[in-house]
Amino acid sequence: MAKYKALASLRYLACLVFLPWGISISFQKGLEPWVTNWWNTGQSREFSDYLQEENALERFGEIEELFLLERMVEDSSETHSQDLRIEIRKKTIQLVEMYNEDLIQIISHLLANFICFATPGAYFILGKEKLVVLNSWIQELFHSLSDTMKAFSILLVTDLCIGFHSPHGWELMIDSISENYGFSHDEQRISGLVSTFPVISDTIFKYWIFRHLNRISPSLVVIYHSMNE
């Protein structure tokens, strides 16, 4: 019975971790042609204006100013003027293509991420019995450990996952999420989140854990404080 519970729990946990990721990637690859077609038919004009039109226009202006400045120091003959117009046109077309590709990727990521978040919710609802088995197995596994191992496990999880001892990991994660949703890299925003969110999460998690553990195993709290010092 214990072996069956362990296998069922590990299988459920693996599906919970990898299934949303796999479905998200599959849907994203399937959605990209549809989003590209929708984008190129002109039905997305308002969405485009809402997202990044101002940034795109600024970049168009920058390109034109750059080439004008470059050509001003050269001969201002008719041939050079013609070359300038052709070069600006080529660069503008390239920028429009890059702009469209970026927005198509953003829309595809948004739809795929929505599906990725919806999948675990549906899996929780449809697999309530398996969730109960997983919860029971985790509790049995945790309570079977010695108090020293329990304290070590809690210390490892809190410091590694939600603690404030790994700012570089948090920076990479926040930057990756921001890029995935189409936001530009903002060092000030990332630094603000890294300096506040992990500390708050760590405090709340430890308070919740030891409010519960103080009732069932006071010795565990003593061991934890000794190891933490």
Curated annotation (Swiss-Prot):
Family per record: Belongs to the CemA family.
Keyword Transmembrane helix included in the entry's annotation: yes
Entry membrane topology: Multi-pass membrane protein
Main localization of the protein described in the UniProt heading: plastid
Residues passing through the membrane, by range: 7-27, 106-126
Primary role: Contributes to K(+)/H(+) antiport activity by supporting proton efflux to control proton extrusion and homeostasis in chloroplasts in a light-dependent manner to modulate photosynthesis. Prevents excessive induction of non-photochemical quenching (NPQ) under continuous-light conditions. Indirectly promotes efficient inorganic carbon uptake into chloroplasts.
Location within or outside the cell: Plastid, Chloroplast inner membrane
Example GO molecular function: antiporter activity
Protein name: Potassium/proton antiporter CemA
